[in-house]
Design a protein with these regions (language model features):
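Short runs within selected transmembrane alpha-helices of multi-pass transporters and secretion channels
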Residues: 77, 145-164, 172-180, 201-214, ...
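Helix-terminus/linker motif at the lipid-water interface of multi-pass membrane proteins
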Residues: 38-56, 126-133, 189-196, 256-289, ...
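Interfacial/gating helices of multi-pass transporter permease domains
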Residues: 47-67, 133-138, 198-199, 240-247, ...
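Residue-level signal for short hydrophobic patches within transmembrane helices
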Residues: 15, 19-38, 42, 65-72, ...
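Transmembrane helical elements of multi-pass membrane transporters/channels
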Residues: 24-43, 145, 156, 179, ...
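Short alpha-helical transmembrane segments in multi-pass integral membrane proteins
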Residues: 1-26, 84-149, 193-249, 305-372, ...
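Small-residue-rich hydrophobic transmembrane alpha-helices
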Residues: 56-116, 153-172, 279-343, 376-398
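Hydrophobic transmembrane alpha-helices of multi-pass small-molecule transporters
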Residues: 68-71, 115, 183-188, 213-217, ...
Length: 453
């Protein structure tokens, strides 16, 4: 028999203080993301300091490609969770489980098709982004191993997204802790102990992601049986599949469209040489560590808005957006106090002091991006709020704005300013996206309030 709601495993975000609900949901997300980025930093440090700058460049040369493909997978799975959150907010649990059942079917198809196509075109994609010849072979091996893990990536993001749709962000955090610790241990064994190099880093990621999927399955079966479909809920439903795809595919495409701009930017940067590729890799690792707070406040807003839309509580949505913006601005001040004086020291985690050029260029990237963090924070809050309200097409258009901006930077700023042009790639993209998202959210919020009234 399927249980109904358990207060210990679910979190109703339609009641109580909006600020408290968002913080309670966001903290495990932020800690989990920081943990994940700390793993990536440790991984990059192991690769850069023990294998060499060339190996670090090999891993970095494929980063935008990974964002293109994994971004589509992760974004689609996040979109599949939106109808689940809305049905949970409306207390329609049978409908919620039917969405779960149909989203699993879609995810299996996505996993097979995306893995197959990614592996076939791996080499051609690396050539397309001007991967330096001296690191091409290592980049190819690393990327192929990442592609082999796509089914695990989709599985984890689908299941953890459904757990979070019910307001539980703690459990996926615990699973990330476990997977990250295993990943770091395997890095030590495979890279330092067995000398497998970049190949060892890829294998470690593959195994740890598989474990995270198994942990999600175990938790749902034991503690969140409210998500397990039964009887008629397991049937294929064309209408629900259509709703899931309408939410998931635009969110996936939003990440992929954004990634196309990143690929253009990285391609322009790769053409500058290996030192700049290594600097880009190091700076992106630290950047993601700091920007994860903005990202996960946004993720919290998607679930918050989804549940409150299902409960038809539009005023709480506006209150939540304002509270999130205040949180974002406070956090920006903290990042500025850390990044501006200590950016150079942070970059020395990845390379020896003798690699002065890499350190200098990477620190410059961090400082320029930091000035524009409020633009990024506003972007994530509004974009995820729009997604939670079920209008993924609008959020996808913001990704188009980012792509246009990064392509423009790649075609004009980088040839004119070289590395400094690369440093302005993200800030210009964030500003362009905000110019679209601010009026889009205001229009959508007024439109939905009229519908509810």
């Amino acid at each position: 028999m399927v249980k109904t709601q358990s207060s210990k495993s679910t979190n109703d975000m339609t009641v109580g203080s909006p600020l408290r609900a968002i913080i309670k949901f966001a903290i495990p997300l932020i800690l989990g993301y920081i943990l994940q980025q700390m793993y990536l930093i440790i991984d990059a440090a192991i690769v850069g300091r023990w294998i060499g700058v060339g190996a670090l460049a090999a891993v970095g040369a494929s980063s935008s490609i990974m964002f293109l493909i994994m971004g589509f997978c992760n974004g689609s799975c996040a979109g599949f969770a939106i109808p689940v959150a809305q049905a949970f907010g409306a207390k329609d649990y049978a409908k919620m489980r039917a969405y779960v059942s149909n989203s699993i079917r879609i995810a299996v198809v996505f996993a097979v098709v995306i893995t197959f196509l990614s592996c076939i075109f791996c080499g051609k994609i690396l050539h397309l982004v001007n991967t330096p010849k001296e690191v091409f072979d290592d980049a190819y091996i690393f990327l192929m191993l990442q592609f082999a893990a796509i089914p695990f990536t989709i599985g984890y993001n689908l299941l953890s997204g459904q757990i979070r749709a019910l307001g539980n962000s703690k459990q996926p955090f615990y699973f990330l802790i476990t997977a990250s610790v295993i990943n770091i241990i395997l890095d030590g064994i495979l890279i330092l102990g067995m000398g497998l190099g970049v190949e060892g880093a890829g294998i470690a990621t593959w195994l740890s992601q598989g474990i995270s999927v198994l942990l999600c399955i175990w938790f749902i079966k034991k503690k969140m049986q409210i998500l397990i479909p039964k009887g008629e809920e397991r049937k294929f439903d064309n209408k629900k599949v259509s709703i899931l795809l309408n939410n998931g595919v635009p969110m996936g495409l939003q990440f992929s469209i954004t990634a196309i701009g990143l690929i253009m930017l990285q391609s322009a940067n790769n053409a500058l040489g290996m030192v700049y590729v290594a600097a880009f890799t190091a700076s992106m690792r630290i950047k993601y560590l700091f920007t994860c707070v903005f990202e996960n406040i946004g993720v919290a807003m998607a679930t918050y808005c989804g549940q409150n839309l299902g409960a038809r509580k539009l005023d709480r949505i506006g209150q939540g957006v304002r509270a999130s913006i205040r949180m974002m601005l406070v956090y920006f001040v903290l990042t500025f106090l850390l990044i501006y004086p200590f950016a150079d020291e942070m970059m020395m985690l990845f390379v020896d002091k003798g690699e002065a050029e890499v350190v200098t260029y990477a620190a410059q990237f961090m400082r320029i991006a930091n000035y524009f963090y409020p633009c990024l924070g506003l972007l994530t809050i509004l974009r995820y709020s729009i997604q939670g309200l079920g209008y993924s097409n609008l959020s996808m258009l913001s990704g188009v704005m980012e792509m246009i901006a990064r392509c423009g930077v790649s075609l004009w700023l980088v040839p004119a300013l070289a590395w400094t042009g690369v440093c302005f790639g993200d800030p210009v993209a964030w500003v362009m996206a905000d110019l679209f998202l601010i009026p889009a959210f205001l229009w959508l919020y007024k439109h939905l309030k009229k519908e509810v009234l």
